[in-house]
Regions:
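Phosphate-binding glycine-rich/basic clefts of nucleotide- and phosphate-handling proteins
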Residues: 7-93, 111
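Acidic, glycine/GT-rich loop-and beta-edge segments that sit at the periphery of enzyme/chaperone cores
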Residues: 38, 156-167
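Short, small-residue-biased leader/transition segments that mark boundaries at the very start
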Residues: 1-5, 166
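Residue-level signature of catalytic and energy-coupling elements of molecular machines
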Residues: 25, 96, 118, 154
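Short, surface-exposed connector motifs at secondary-structure boundaries
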Residues: 7-9, 109-114, 136-139
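Phosphate/ATP-binding catalytic cores across multiple sugar-kinase/actin-like superfamilies
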Residues: 84-111, 157-160
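Conserved phosphate-binding/catalytic loops in two-lobed NTP-binding clefts
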Residues: 130-155
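Glycine-rich phosphate-binding loops at beta-strand->alpha-helix junctions
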Residues: 50, 54, 108-132
């Protein structure tokens, strides 16, 4: 998470990428359902019924039943996925709050007017923007190609390392 001010980037590492969401889903299903799924299945669950708020959606997925040891199919509900991801959603909000608290007052009004941007593939998770808005009261912008914005931002920083101020 970063904030550009006077050609300096204020940043805070948020180690919450798509893989962390997928791992949380895998672990929750294994613990609660005694059922093992792979990373691709977890990604499918996340992008199909993953949401910052509980919905009435569900998805049938294949994996291995840990009780029988056999391949099987199970229905995963939105509440299961939300339970797995809610702590990560809150961690994102907490990290945004920290960087906003460190933002110079000169640009706080710009942030208030323009909002914050969610980037990265996981920003596509349903209602994540609404969750951040509900928690912070700030406009939330979602990028058209969130995966690309992360790469472009890192590229800009690599080209000019003086932009970085890490705390």
């Amino acid at each position: 998470l970063g904030d550009v001010y006077k050609r300096q980037v204020l940043s805070r590492l948020i180690p919450i990428g798509g893989n962390r969401f997928d791992e949380a889903i895998i672990n929750k299903i294994k613990k609660d359902k005694s059922f093992v799924i792979g990373e691709k299945t977890a990604e499918e669950i996340k992008m199909t019924i993953g949401s910052a708020y509980v919905t009435d959606e569900s998805i049938d997925v294949c994996g291995r039943n840990l009780v029988t040891g056999l391949p099987s199919e199970i229905t995963i509900e939105s509440k299961d996925v939300h339970s797995a991801l809610s702590e990560l959603f809150q961690s994102i909000v907490d990290a945004v709050k920290i960087i906003l608290e460190r933002t110079p007052p000169e640009i706080s009004s710009d942030i208030y007017k323009s909002g914050v941007y969610l980037t990265g593939g996981s920003s596509r998770i349903k209602d994540l923007g609404r969750f951040v808005y509900d928690q912070l009261g700030l406009k939330v912008n979602l990028c058209e190609e969130p995966e690309s914005t992360v790469v472009m931002g890192l590229g800009a920083i690599i080209e000019d390392l003086s932009l970085i101020h890490i705390s």
